[in-house]
Amino acid sequence: MEFETVIGLEIHAQLKTNTKIFCACSTQYGAAPNSHTCPICLGMPGVLPVLNKKVVEYSIKMGLATGSRINQWNQFARKNYFYPDLPKGYQTSQFDLPIVEGGHIEIEVDGVSKVIGITRMHMEEDAGKLVHDDVEPVSHVDLNRTGTPLLEIVSEPDMRSPQEAYAYLKKVHAILRYLDICDGNMQEGSFRCDANISLRPMGQEKLGTRTELKNMNSFKNVQAALEYEVRRQRDLLLEGEKVIQQTLLWDPDKNRTEAMRGKEDAHDYRYFPCPDLVPIEISDEWIEEIRASLPELPEQCKARFIVDYALSEDDAVQLTSERDLALFFEEVVAAGAHPKKSANWIMTELLRELGGESIVDCRVQASQLSALLLMVDQGMISGKIAKTVFAEMMAEGTDPQLIVKEKNLLQVSDEGELLAIVDEIVAANVQQAEDFRAGKTKLMGFFVGQLMKKTKGKANPGLANELFNKALNK
């Protein structure tokens, strides 16, 4: 029997505000445990929350960027449950009156475009964090994160494969980063994702029993967890067993999911309107003001790169997948490097050297990479030497001109100097020279290689080919 995979994602994006959603405590990551707390964060009796206006503004920005409807009358609600990292016994969230509804995200997988619907986005406060002791069988509670503003983005169950879910997650991440409302750091927990997944017989409309996947702290883990859960549910169904509705944790060390608890429904949380916060009313004027302030988004940036820099669509897609990468590319070009050559170097040499790290952590500045590419264009160094220089730039952050000077790597373009070596090589390889003249033109690589050995890779390759052609065709 064939099954269809149905996936919906719930993305929790920490909004990049200086203070928390309902109090003036800092949202700084990495502070000493429980140092950024106050009676409001901790849910002490008699305190009242005050809504951070920036949280509303950032939520509207994301709604506008995804073609969603902004609910100009929305309301906070209490989501009631007990957990050690939730000191109030409830989370202030939104339920039946969220700030954003509808909208969509367009993704592309294997060259095929698809629109993924958005159900809703709502504002809420983050919970604290449990830190499990490596030695003692205890867990410590850090409440610094409590009250950090979150925007939860809930998709429609429109994804039909882990690959589509991965593409959707990356696209949402990119939009948040372009809007500069979330830093998107999955390792620090500022961009988190839960997945609801079920299988149903191909052609059936009714959804199957779903499970919820948690603890996926990287894009790679999201795809791996979804692929595992698809296989697990398919195996159960093929064996005639039932899928149990439950919450599962992904264990990246064991590459498998483990049961956490039964999956809750909305009624389990006993939502009711928050009595401490009045409903929010958003004016048309404020929405239009925010709309006018929206920056260029990934799709717009991609279209501009194709037109302004004559890049292919594939190159433009890759360069605009991350806001910082797009900015780096434009800085390289602005410093004088050729757009296409800049794109090629960034997508091959630079990304390979980074090895999955963010461009923000790159030790090479855009102006330095531009200077290196200009040295190649001007014939000062060869492309091969440039790769060696670039590796040292990545390691030390040194200017390319200094590396080339200190290591005496300037390209040899003196025709007289090279011609003497060319004649010497031809004279020493009589048989290869005769074979070349007989039609084995691929031997040109052999001759140029000999020249590169003698010049330690510094010979101008274009001039080398020209000189060998003359010498071998006398």
From Swiss-Prot:
EC nos: 6.3.5.-
Q: Which InterPro entries did the record assign?
A: Asn/Gln-tRNA_amidoTrfase_suB/E, Asn/Gln-tRNA_Trfase_suB/E_cat, Asn/Gln_amidotransferase, Asn/Gln_tRNA_amidoTrase-B-like, GatB, GatB_C_1, GatB_Yqey_C_2, Gln-tRNA_amidoTrfase_suB_CS
The disulfide bridges present are none
Q: Which GO terms describe its molecular function?
A: asparaginyl-tRNA synthase (glutamine-hydrolyzing) activity; ATP binding; glutaminyl-tRNA synthase (glutamine-hydrolyzing) activity
Q: What is known about its subunit structure?
A: Heterotrimer of A, B and C subunits.
By its UniProt entry, which Pfam families does this protein fall under? GatB_N, GatB_Yqey
The entry sums up its family as follows:
Belongs to the GatB/GatE family. GatB subfamily.
Q: What class of enzyme is it?
A: ligase
Upper lineage is: Bacteria, Pseudomonadati, Thermodesulfobacteriota, Desulfobulbia, Desulfobulbales
Q: What does this protein do?
A: Allows the formation of correctly charged Asn-tRNA(Asn) or Gln-tRNA(Gln) through the transamidation of misacylated Asp-tRNA(Asn) or Glu-tRNA(Gln) in organisms which lack either or both of asparaginyl-tRNA or glutaminyl-tRNA synthetases. The reaction takes place in the presence of glutamine and ATP through an activated phospho-Asp-tRNA(Asn) or phospho-Glu-tRNA(Gln).
Read off the PANTHER family from this record: GLUTAMYL-TRNA GLN AMIDOTRANSFERASE SUBUNIT B MITOCHONDRIAL AND PROKARYOTIC PET112-RELATED, GLUTAMYL-TRNA(GLN) AMIDOTRANSFERASE SUBUNIT B, MITOCHONDRIAL
In terms of domain of life, where is this protein from? Bacteria
Give the record's GO biological process terms.
Answer: glutaminyl-tRNAGln biosynthesis via transamidation; translation
Q: Which reaction does it catalyse?
A: L-glutamyl-tRNA(Gln) + L-glutamine + ATP + H2O = L-glutaminyl-tRNA(Gln) + L-glutamate + ADP + phosphate + H(+); L-aspartyl-tRNA(Asn) + L-glutamine + ATP + H2O = L-asparaginyl-tRNA(Asn) + L-glutamate + ADP + phosphate + 2 H(+)
Q: Which UniProt keywords apply?
A: ATP-binding, Ligase, Nucleotide-binding, Protein biosynthesis
This one is known as: Aspartyl/glutamyl-tRNA(Asn/Gln) amidotransferase subunit B
Keyword Transmembrane helix in the entry? The reply is no
Q: Sorted alphabetically, which HAMAP family does this protein's record hold?
A: GatB
